[in-house]
């Protein structure tokens, strides 16, 4: 395992141990619902299913189709807030 992968694993473990990972996931979930992201993605899924027909779409197809759009639709403000929370966490646990 290279140094970056090892550092990521250590940080992830610390996020899990402290419960911060779950708090970050909840924050993200709430922010995405609040900004309408979830509704936009749901509508996009419906459009894809209508376009291709229910019988011709698998879950994997749907995921492959909507993932790029889903990532692109996450508002910068949400990304920045989450990144700031992660940076704050890392600063508080600098001994990693």
UniProtKB/Swiss-Prot annotation:
An example molecular function term from Gene Ontology annotations: transcription coactivator activity
Coiled coil: none
Signal peptide positions (record): none
A Gene Ontology term for the protein's cellular component: SAGA complex
Pfam families documented for this protein: EnY2 (PF10163)
Domain of life: Eukaryota
Disulfide bonds: none
Compartments reported by the entry: Nucleus, Nucleoplasm
Alphabetic keyword roster: Activator, Chromatin regulator, mRNA transport, Nucleus, Protein transport, Transcription, Transcription regulation, Translocation, Transport
GO BP of this protein: chromatin organization; poly(A)+ mRNA export from nucleus; positive regulation of DNA-templated transcription; protein transport; regulation of transcription by RNA polymerase II; transcription elongation by RNA polymerase II
Keyword Transcription regulation: yes
Family statement: Belongs to the ENY2 family.
Job of this protein: Involved in mRNA export coupled transcription activation by association with both the TREX-2 and the SAGA complexes. The transcription regulatory histone acetylation (HAT) complex SAGA is a multiprotein complex that activates transcription by remodeling chromatin and mediating histone acetylation and deubiquitination. Within the SAGA complex, participates in a subcomplex that specifically deubiquitinates histones. The SAGA complex is recruited to specific gene promoters by activators, where it is required for transcription.
PANTHER family per record: ENHANCER OF YELLOW 2 TRANSCRIPTION FACTOR (PTHR12514)
Subunit structure: Component of the nuclear pore complex (NPC)-associated TREX-2 complex (transcription and export complex 2). Component of the SAGA transcription coactivator-HAT complex. Within the SAGA complex, participates in a subcomplex of SAGA called the DUB module (deubiquitination module).
Protein name, entry field: Transcription and mRNA export factor ENY2
Encoding gene, per UniProt annotation: ENY2
